């Protein structure tokens, strides 16, 4: 896997760890990653750079291999906030090839960086601070002091529903990923096993040989979820 440019014995995070390692190691000026549940933001944090997951629909997903379609987004990985804004402005355009594409709303982000933050409200969920390491907590508190000195209003609030976020994420992500991976059957595109007896044998061998063990476990584990969601959620959608 990709190594952390600041310490080769450490990982770069994932899943967009390769691009974060390249940008953090000054191999690339910027990069694009895909983020479903932190895959841009986590490696960017590990490598000491800026990673942004845009609002859903702001950036076209056309060409991205889908994992969980309702959560996937493409975003910039850069060494500064200014660069992130410039790259985001360049990629946040409406694309008719993506049915969920909305494009950027409002003024270009790079232009808004010149504005001060006086009077802006910045919310911090108390639950996010639970279990945070002391040095990380101090870094957050130091950042809060900077924002306050610049005129921002810091608001601490409770988010009790946060405890459901992870299980809900895994239910939706696994079910959608399992469905999306169903297209890789060796018929249209992707890997195809060279030896098979019939169509069923070809599909079974293709998916067994082409998918790693972790992906196979995900597909099998998600099947009951897909059936349950399709039955109970039919009227909602």
Task: Map each language-model feature to its residues.
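Short glycine/serine-rich loop segments
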Residues: 1-91
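Short helix-loop capping/hinge segments that flank enzyme active sites or metal/cofactor-binding pockets
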Residues: 116-123, 175-237
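A short helix-breaking turn/cap at a secondary-structure junction
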Residues: 53-141, 200-205
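Short glycine-enriched loop/turn motifs at secondary-structure junctions
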Residues: 67-71, 163-165, 237
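Acyltransferase
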Residues: 108-111, 132-159, 189-194, 205-206, ...
């Amino acid at each position: 896997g990709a190594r952390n440019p600041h310490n080769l014995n450490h990982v770069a995070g994932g899943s967009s760890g390769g691009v974060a390692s390249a940008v953090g190691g000054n191999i690339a000026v910027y990069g694009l990653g895909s983020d479903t549940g932190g895959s841009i933001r986590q490696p960017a944090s590990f490598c000491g750079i800026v990673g942004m997951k845009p609002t859903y629909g702001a950036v076209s997903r056309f060409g991205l291999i889908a994992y969980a379609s309702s959560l996937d987004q493409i975003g910039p990985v850069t060494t500064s906030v200014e660069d992130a804004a410039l790259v985001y402005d360049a990629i946040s355009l409406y694309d008719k090839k993506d049915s969920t594409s909305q494009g950027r709303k409002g003024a270009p982000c790079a232009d808004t960086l010149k504005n001060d933050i006086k009077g802006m409200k910045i919310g911090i969920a108390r639950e996010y601070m639970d279990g945070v390491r002391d040095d990380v907590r101090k870094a957050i508190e130091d950042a809060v002091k900077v924002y306050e000195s610049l005129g921002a209003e810091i608001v601490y609030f409770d988010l009790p529903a946060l405890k459901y976020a992870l299980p809900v994420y895994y239910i939706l992500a696994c079910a959608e990923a399992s469905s999306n991976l169903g297209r890789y059957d060796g018929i249209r595109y992707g890997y195809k096993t060279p030896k098979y007896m019939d169509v069923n044998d070809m599909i079974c061998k293709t998916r067994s040989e082409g998918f790693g063990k972790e992906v196979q476990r995900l597909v099998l584990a998600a099947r009951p979820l897909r059936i349950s969601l399709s039955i109970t959620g039919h009227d909602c959608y």
